[in-house]
């Protein structure tokens, strides 16, 4: 089922991980998907892909540095999203849902651990 998708599609405090760099990057990802929903064009998709790659790398570095036990599972989730962006079919609803559910299930597992 999953978590409800916010409308308007913006980050809110319920998505807080309490790591400022990660929360700031999550806000950027929400913004990128929001803009893609308004105008599904190559520029918006490219910007979202760039921001997503940067965020995933930063998050993975933090997880590796702390020897986070669910690193491999988490990285596979990231790879799924990157693959979807690299093979974009225009499914903004899926992207919105993926980010919301990824943060609230997968990312929340590392709260206080990285």
From Swiss-Prot:
Fe cation 1 binds at residues 26, 55, 59, 107. Changing residue 99 to Y: Decreased auto-oxidation rate. One of its GO terms (molecular function) is iron ion binding. Changing residue 97 to A: In minor and major variants. Transmembrane segments: none annotated. The keyword ATP-binding does not apply. InterPro entries: Haemerythrin, Haemerythrin_Fe_BS, Hemerythrin, Hemerythrin-like, Hemerythrin-like_sf, Hemerythrin_metal-bd. The sequence from one of the four major component variants is shown. NCBIfam families: hemeryth_dom, Hemerythrin. Homooctamer. Hemerythrin is a respiratory protein in blood cells of certain marine worms. The oxygen-binding site in each chain contains two iron atoms. This is Hemerythrin. It comes from Phascolopsis gouldii.
């Amino acid at each position: 089922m999953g978590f409800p998708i916010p409308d308007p599609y913006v980050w809110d405090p319920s998505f807080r991980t309490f790591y400022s760099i990660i929360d700031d990057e999550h806000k950027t990802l929400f913004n990128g998907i929001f803009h893609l929903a308004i105008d599904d064009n190559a520029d918006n998709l490219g910007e979202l892909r760039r921001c997503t790659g940067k965020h995933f790398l930063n998050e993975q570095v933090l997880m590796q540095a702390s020897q986070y036990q669910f690193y491999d599972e988490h990285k596979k989730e990231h790879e799924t999203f990157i693959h979807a962006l690299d093979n974009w079919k225009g499914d903004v609803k899926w992207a919105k849902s993926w980010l919301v559910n990824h943060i609230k299930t997968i990312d929340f597992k590392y709260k206080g651990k990285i």
